[in-house]
Regions:
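Structured loop/turn residues at beta-strand edges in well-structured enzyme cores
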Residues: 7, 56, 91, 143, ...
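Glycine-rich, highly charged phosphate/nucleotide-binding loops
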Residues: 39-54
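A short, Lys/Arg-enriched amphipathic alpha-helix followed by its capping loop at the start of a domain
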Residues: 14-22
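Single conserved hydrophobic/aromatic residue that forms the stacking wall/gate
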Residues: 1-8, 13, 186-189
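A short beta-strand-loop structural module common to alpha/beta enzyme folds
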Residues: 21-34
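Cysteine-nucleophile active-site neighborhood
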Residues: 58, 63-134
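Pocket-forming structural segment of enzyme catalytic cores
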Residues: 109-188
Length: 189
């Protein structure tokens, strides 16, 4: 079973639905924040809370983005709840995938890696290169592939490479670090 947290759940579900594998998806929303753009009735109908799943185990967790990247992490109204979810994921989730702002949050929470401003909004589709073809998550990727970005912040390559638990799997000259793996938590078979 896969748990999808924060926002962007519908997109993640559509992306995961094109597979012969049977996947059960649970969508979770943080309860410490009231959404300005999604109705409470929609959230109550399609999402659960962290408290409701706290004692469960999941094969995967996807922590998605949020339009809060210009704020300091501790200023985000639901940071404490998200930090609790990330801590819980260490024991209750087999594999966690952080995307967009969720990736910046995960790198900060788990490794103390600070986000850094890009100087101007990075927006567009950029060329990326694989750095390790043997990793299972990128086996079907071309050596060079294109991916979209829309953000004001990223992380420094040197900060990622300086952490012995992290492996940079893909990067872009224009967009920077793209795909980072935790070697301690998720080892290749």
């Amino acid at each position: 079973e896969i748990l999808i947290g924060l926002v962007g759940s519908e997109m993640c579900i559509r992306d995961r639905s094109n597979t012969p594998l049977q996947v059960n998806v649970t969508c979770m929303n943080v309860s410490s924040h009231v959404s300005k753009h999604t109705s409470a009735s929609h959230i109550n109908k399609f999402y659960t809370t962290f408290e409701a799943v706290r004692n469960m185990y999941f094969d995967g967790l996807i922590i998605t983005g949020a339009p809060v990247e210009t704020m300091e992490f501790e200023e985000v109204s639901y940071w404490e709840e998200l930090a609790s979810i990330m801590e819980w994921s260490k024991t209750n989730v087999t594999s966690t995938f952080h995307i967009c702002w969720g990736a910046l949050a995960g790198l900060y929470y788990h490794y103390g890696i600070q986000k850094t401003p890009t100087g101007k909004k990075l927006s567009g589709v950029y060329s990326h290169r694989l750095l390790d073809r043997c990793e299972p998550i990128v086996r079907s990727f071309d050596d060079v592939f294109y991916a979209p970005h829309s953000r004001y912040f990223g992380v420094k390559r040197d900060d990622v490479l300086a952490n012995e638990h992290l492996m940079l799997l893909a990067e872009s000259d224009e967009a920077g670090c793209y795909l980072i793996k935790d070697c301690l938590l998720y080892t290749s078979p």
